[in-house]
């Protein structure tokens, strides 16, 4: 038949947060992962082989089109498993490095001063070729990475001071 089944929800969703301390230093890490789900990558569908017309599409994707399974992928956008990819990923969401100084020896108005820096959206480890494997997994269009839904996820840098009175 012409039915297509997408595993749009991960089999496993997990996260790990930990803080390591050594003397006055602390290092925190926040990671999470989704494993075992499919993403329909619409980028190549709209911008790749189907986005071209005529002979140009055959030159770009010739090896893939030699397979009879994909002989009819051209022209009008067609949803098919050709654009289905494993969306499993591991994201390092944040890493924080801090240093705490005991102030009670020097002043009566504060006990401790902590200076820290955080990097957000550190890395995404995935085999997915699209923009971001973390797509909507609920509703009618779960598991679809849409071309028009492509706001970049920025890396952030934060510096902070924490005072304990």
Segment roles from a protein language model:
Residues 24-28, 104:
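Repeated loop/turn-to-beta-strand initiation elements of outer-membrane beta-barrel proteins
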Residues 77-79, 124-165:
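C-terminal beta-signal and terminal closure region of outer-membrane beta-barrel proteins
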Residues 7, 84-86, 146-150:
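Outer-membrane beta-barrel domain signature
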